[in-house]
Amino acid sequence: MHRLRLLLSIVALTSTALLCSAADRILFLSLAPTYARLFISNADGSGERPLTQPGSLDYNPSWSPKGDWIVFTSERAGSADLYRIHPDGSGLDRLTDDPAYDDQGSFSPNEKEIVFVTTRAERRANLWVLDVGTRKARSLTSGNGGDFRPAWSPDGKWIAFSSDRGSSLPPAKGRWERLHLVDIYLIRPDGSDLKRISAHGNFCGSPKWTQDSKSVIAYCMSGEETWKYRFGDEDGETELVKIDIATGESKPVVSGPGVKISPTVLA
């Protein structure tokens, strides 16, 4: 029987860890009062070393499918732009140079393109696609709401992402705030066939693909649970779910106490 292995983060003082597709290296983010820095280590935690230099804000790293590049966001030049670097720390390369906010890059399977979040158009967080060779970028999504955490499917046919797309949540009992619900969507790399695959009414995010490109793993919590997490005096609770992209069927993968975010599929 095929078993799904996951690496996930628990909300605490630690940061998101990302295992290389070869399962031999871990990439993680270290937070300090004045900077955010990327580190890399062996899969067993040994050999920890810095990947980027201190003094700048580097965050939201993502491995390329072959494991030869890491794309990340950096504010070292003043605005949030995309950079890439080899796992040994060589070949630092600035990919975008725009006054808008460019963030959350994800490589295509052939590593020739990167889908990312940007505020270049309409002052909203939409998805764009960057040609790594030419450095030309094109718009992928538009409309109301924000689109976040894009992830390219291993077969290259879909891009999964989370979006609030105008969905609002009524105020919780005794509170005046409103919070947008967030769903998981799919879109083709050419911008066609946009569809929602998560059950509406929850707060779902950080989609990741299974290796067969047939399912998406994401964290989900009920709308009411989000209030506990936001105010800090109560413990929130999320579960990781596996969503079949053909049927929309959702099955829990990891549940129980605690706020679980940013899953990474290992196999």
Question: Which residues fall in each region the model found?
Answer:
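An edge-strand/N-cap motif at the start of beta-rich repeat modules
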Residues: S21-R49
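Hydrophobic beta-strand positions that form the internal "hydrophobic ladder"
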Residues: I26, I70, I114-V115, I159, ...
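A flexible loop/linker signature enriched in serine peptidases of the S9 family
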Residues: S30-F39, T52-L57, T73-Y83, T96-Y101, ...
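Bacterial N-terminal signal peptides
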Residues: L8-A17
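Short loop/turn segments that connect beta-strands within beta-propeller blades
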Residues: N42-S46, H86-S90, D131-R135, R188-S192, ...
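A structural motif specific to WD40 beta-propellers
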Residues: E48-R49, L92-D93, R138, L194-K195, ...
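Residue-level detector of Asp-centered blade-edge/turn motifs that repeat once per structural unit
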Residues: S21-A22, P65-K66, P109-N110, P154-D155, ...
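Conserved beta-strand position repeated across blades of beta-propeller domains
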Residues: S62, S106, A151, K208, ...
